[in-house]
């Protein structure tokens, strides 16, 4: 049986190893809410959520908010603000933070957008995979990893779904990513599941949803669905669908 090397922290702070195979077997039949509850009970103060405040982000944030109401233990929500998000995303974030009473932690690159462009140019315009990898490392992966380190996070949950990309289709509910546990409560959810959950709980849609966007990231690399091109295939003109945050390599290696 595989024994993972990343330590888990119990609620009282005592370190203990996680048996990855056993944890996956335990998580497989659980609902998304039950997976979140398991993670909070297992990792205690070392558990956090990440969010992009994108089209489907409200679902996991709402679940975390409801769990906090039950347990009385707020879950930190880490948001990577690249400095290039659409105005609508910033407005949507403010609305959800207020409505769901989120404990928000904003992570930003130590390098301002202006400085990055002065030193490296507009990396998203070159259509070069290496430039996109550098962009994602500077603006997304490094800020996230720094924030998780500052918060002493040992497990973070995200809203990735298996149907979004080929890479995500092969994911497990729990994996080790860059020396931390990565939990995917919504991995088996469909777009329909997301939509009906938001309708049932009267969660607001991202303003760009009504303009035909099924996913939204930075303003310069997101587009509404068009014909056969939809979802994350609209990112960076279809050149790249993963930003490195959910990839196992150090600081986005292999993006």
Where would I find each of the regions flagged by the language model?
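Nucleotide-activated chemistry modules centered on ATP-dependent adenylation/adenylyltransferase
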Residues: 2-255
